[in-house]
């Protein structure tokens, strides 16, 4: 629900997609520096960005797992609670990755320590559907909004409670677009899930 003049912080090394979207929504975009060893934003560079620009009301922070390495998520989680921002994981490189928090292993995408996690299904990523992506969240409000936005804002929920309602009957409660993958794309992506462990092992060897 990013609005005009809302503050969003991104790592300076990232794909242009997140910046494009924030710019289209007329948000205020700030870029945090990255660690020279990992290429990733760190809690320290995030705090430095906040201090340098005297930011107070931060709406969202995007962390990007360059090379599939979910670095520092637990420390970003502490900052999320402190500054009350939405934490988004750009896990386009990290499908199948895991991280350790308080001695427990978590899958990237579980969204226990973030609000939203996104994966890419581009041909260069871990698995592909030709194009497209995946959004994960544990936030029910965000989930319901995503469901409405993905299909041109169409909402059939109220009518599904009734019996024998016409299939063409629906409401438009939000402006939305068509974010649905075709059946062919979905079939390709689903078939690649069977190979994901093999793909990850090969990438580890190369790394």
Language model features with spans:
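Conserved PLP-anchoring active-site segment centered on the Schiff-base-forming lysine
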Residues: 1-56
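Generic beta-sheet signal
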Residues: 11, 32, 88-90, 120, ...
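Aromatic/hydrophobic pocket-lining residues that form π-stacking "cages" and hydrophobic walls in ligand
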Residues: 18, 76, 146
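Active-site phosphate-binding strand-loop segment of PLP-dependent enzymes
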Residues: 37-129, 134-142
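Active-site region of PLP-dependent enzymes
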Residues: 93-106, 113-207
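Conserved donor-binding loops in enzymes that form glycosidic bonds
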Residues: 12, 66, 193
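Hydrophobic/aromatic ligand-binding patch that stacks against planar heteroaromatic rings
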Residues: 20-22, 79, 184
């Amino acid at each position: 629900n990013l609005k005009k003049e809302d503050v969003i912080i991104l790592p300076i090394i990232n794909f242009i997609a997140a910046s494009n979207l924030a710019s289209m929504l007329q948000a205020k975009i700030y870029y945090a520096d990255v660690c020279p060893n990992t290429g990733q934003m760190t809690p320290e560079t995030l705090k430095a960005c906040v201090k340098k620009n005297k930011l107070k009301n931060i709406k969202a922070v995007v962390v990007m797992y360059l090379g599939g390495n979910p670095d520092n998520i637990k420390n970003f989680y502490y900052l999320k609670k402190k500054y009350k921002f939405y934490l988004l994981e750009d896990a386009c490189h990290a499908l199948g990755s895991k991280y350790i928090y308080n001695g427990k292993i978590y899958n990237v995408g579980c969204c226990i320590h973030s609000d939203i996690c996104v994966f890419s299904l581009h041909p260069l990523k871990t698995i592909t559907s030709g194009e497209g992506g995946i959004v994960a969240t544990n936030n029910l409000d965000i989930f319901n909004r995503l469901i409405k936005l993905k299909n041109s804002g169409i909402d059939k929920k109220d009518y599904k409670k009734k019996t024998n309602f016409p299939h063409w009957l629906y409401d438009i409660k939000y402006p939305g677009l068509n974010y649905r993958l075709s059946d062919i794309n979905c079939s390709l992506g689903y078939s690649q899930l069977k190979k994901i462990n093999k793909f990850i092992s090969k990438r580890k060897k190369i790394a």
